[in-house]
Amino acid sequence: MAAAPRRGAGGERRSGRDDRRGGSADKGVSYIERVVKINRVAKVVKGGRRFSFTALVVVGDGNGMVGVGYGKAKEVPAAIAKGVEEAKKNFFRVPRIGGTIVHQVQGEDAAGVVLLRPAAPGTGVIAGGPVRAVLECAGIHDVLTKSLGSSNPINIVRATVAALKSLSRPEEIAARRGLPLEDVVPAPMLRARAEAKAGV
C-alpha cells in the first residue's frame, strides 16, 4: 500500500504556494494576495533554539474589499496560509470613486503615520511597498501617499488600514454638507466613476 504524502512535501503544496503569490480562488471569487513581510522568530528552549516564521499578508478582491492577516507557523508556506485566512476574516469595504479614494485622509498606528490623497486618473499608485500592497489589493489605482514616523511594515500596513477605514462615501459627504454630489466630487472623478460602472 502506497504511503500517504507527507504534509508540506513538494508537488501539490508547491503548486499551492504559486497560486497564493498570484491570487487564489475561494468559492468562485479570485483574490489578490500580497506577502508584505516574512520574519524568522527564534524561541530559546531547554534543548536549544526553536525557529518559527511569521507572515504579514494582505488579501483583496481588487474591487474595494481588502483585509490584513498575520500568520505564524513552523514553515513559511503554513505561515502565509494562516495569514491569508486571517486576512479574509478581516475584510472591509473601501469607499472609492473611480480608481482613487474619495478624500484626503490620515491613518496612524503606534509610531506609523500614513497620509493618502486622491489623484487624477493615470497617476498610478505613488507609494512604498507596504502601503502599495494594501492599496492595490483594495483596487485603488490612482493615489498619492506619504509615510511618516516608523518604517516597521506592520505599523505602516495597520496605519494604511486605519486610513482606509476612516474614509466616507461621496454620498455621505454630500449629505453632511447639504450639497449635491456634483459640488462635492470633482468632475473628472465622477466621469471615472461612471466609466468604471459602465465597464469602459
Swiss-Prot record:
MF GO annotations: rRNA binding; structural constituent of ribosome
Pfam families: Ribosomal_S5, Ribosomal_S5_C
InterPro entries found in the cross-reference section: Ribosomal_Su5_D2-typ_SF (IPR020568), Ribosomal_uS5 (IPR000851), Ribosomal_uS5_bac-type (IPR005712), Ribosomal_uS5_C (IPR005324), Ribosomal_uS5_N (IPR013810), Ribosomal_uS5_N_CS (IPR018192), Ribsml_uS5_D2-typ_fold_subgr (IPR014721)
Positions in coiled-coil regions: none
GO cellular component, one term: small ribosomal subunit
Annotated ranges, domain S5 DRBM: 31-94
Source taxon at top rank: Bacteria
UniProt keyword annotations, A-Z: Ribonucleoprotein, Ribosomal protein, RNA-binding, rRNA-binding
PANTHER family linked to this entry: MITOCHONDRIAL RIBOSOMAL PROTEIN S5
Free-text note on domains in this protein's UniProt record: The N-terminal domain interacts with the head of the 30S subunit; the C-terminal domain interacts with the body and contacts protein S4. The interaction surface between S4 and S5 is involved in control of translational fidelity.
Function: With S4 and S12 plays an important role in translational accuracy.
Protein name (database record): Small ribosomal subunit protein uS5
